[in-house]
């Protein structure tokens, strides 16, 4: 699904889950959101739940349309956002993982055998990454959910990738309203 001309949704729907985080009923399932930004350089925003590795990697490959990703941006280490970091790194060994200091520290605990030597870009609050025409600015949002959370703002398309800052329960292909607004 295209979000903008250069941003493509690569997430997955989970219709098997009945409780999110073991406590919230989700009768309409869950959506695990991930996006691909296509520019001179490409970026993948977050991964998805571990049970959907193959589907997600296929969605990413389809969105990339034959290109290789330059970056994986990890905004949040909760497993529904990060469980496939290691699978991504294995599938795309040339890609650089972008995250903040706290995220990289947590990543070592989640994936103790994963080697990111020479493949990581540690960002600070307010720093930007230029993909071409898209400029991504990283804004730390600790305790939006977990202490390492950051959000990413694309100033070109004026899109905020909000990690767990906003959202709803429910798969995108069931009982879901898509909200759009005209900024003009």
Where are these regions (language model features)?
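Metallo-beta-lactamase
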Residues: 2-5, 99-149
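Conserved beta-strand hairpin/beta-sheet module of binuclear metal-dependent hydrolase folds
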Residues: 2-64, 151-154, 158-162
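Short, flexible loop segments at the rims of nucleotide/cofactor-binding pockets, characterized by
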Residues: 20-25, 48-50, 74-76, 136-142
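Active-site metal-binding motif and surrounding structural segment of the metallo-beta-lactamase
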Residues: 40, 51-98
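Active-site environment of divalent metal-dependent phosphoester hydrolases
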Residues: 77-82, 105-106, 145-146, 167-170
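Short acidic, glycine/serine/threonine-rich loops at helix termini
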Residues: 87, 109-112, 172-175
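Short, solvent-exposed beta-strand-terminating loops
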Residues: 160-177
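Conserved small/polar residues in nucleotide/adenosyl-binding loops
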Residues: 179-184
